[in-house]
A protein has these predicted regions:
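Residue-level detector of beta-strand structural context in well-folded domains
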Residues: 18, 110, 115-116, 138, ...
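Active-site HxH/HxHxD metal-binding segment of metal-dependent hydrolases
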Residues: 35-119, 202-206
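Short Gly/Pro-enriched turn/cap motifs at secondary-structure boundaries
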Residues: 8-10, 74, 107-109, 129-131
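A generic structural signal for alpha->beta connector loops
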Residues: 2, 76-77, 108, 124, ...
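Hydrophobic residues in well-ordered beta-strands that form the structural core
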Residues: 31, 79-83, 148-149, 189
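Conserved S/T- and glycine-rich ATP-binding loop of Class I adenylate-forming
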Residues: 20, 57, 130
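Metallo-beta-lactamase
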Residues: 26, 49, 93-98, 102, ...
Length: 208
């Protein structure tokens, strides 16, 4: 398997939406859905990728806003999220009260669990539950890459000042699960540039 990772970012929040593709089979997944879903749709079409699933690292509005558009573009592919945040997608319940109602309401959501291997075509992701920014935050590892959502960023970590956040759990999850990965593991975050586990281990001021 030869993986190709491409990123699109919306202009409002700079939220990253990823297309992860097996270049040999064209099987692909989209990780997170930002406010400009047309960007990743066009990218997938240009690549000739066959999107098999949409995986969510968490359910902040800026990471799920384009779910309906992605479903329309790619057909009724599975949408997978941690059980703790399933209601946000199924019932449109806002994770953050300041956002108000969310027009998702997709009733056939698949759940992700710690330690699970999620398979989408020829792609296999290991699920790492990394809560703290949100209760059901997950990181998704495949080969030498890990997609960390809003848990770990280049030089920073996720916010934990929300009512349903937990700063101690966030740091513990990063230390025990993400920093346990090889130094050369490439980190793709929910916002900002890519980094590596080794770089964050050595230089991230929130983890020193």
């Amino acid at each position: 398997m030869h993986l190709r990772v491409e990123v699109t970012a919306d202009r409002r929040f700079g939220t990253n939406s990823y297309l992860v593709e097996d270049e040999e089979t064209r099987d692909a997944v989209v990780i997170d859905s930002n406010l400009e879903p047309d960007l990743v749709v066009e990218l997938a079409r240009r690549r000739g990728a066959a999107v098999r699933a949409i995986l969510l690292t968490h359910t902040d509005l800026d990471h799920i806003a384009g779910l309906h558009e992605l479903r329309e573009a790619f057909g009724k592919v599975p949408i997978a999220v941690h059980e703790a945040e399933r209601d946000v997608v199924e019932q449109g319940k806002p994770l953050r009260s300041e956002f108000g109602p969310i027009a998702t309401q997709i009733d056939d959501v698949t759940t992700l669990a710690e330690g699970e291997i999620y398979r989408a075509g020829t792609l296999e992701f290991e699920v790492l539950h990394t809560p703290g920014h949100s209760p059901g935050g997950v990181s998704l590892k495949i080969d030498g890459y890990v997609f960390t959502g809003d848990a770990l960023f280049a030089g920073s970590i996720g916010r934990s000042d929300f009512a349903n956040s937990d700063g101690s759990a966030l740091v513990e999850g990063i230390r025990s699960k993400l920093l346990a990965l090889a130094d050369d593991t490439i980190v793709y975050s929910g916002h900002g540039p890519a980094t590596t586990i080794g770089r964050e281990r050595k230089t991230n001021p929130f983890l020193s």
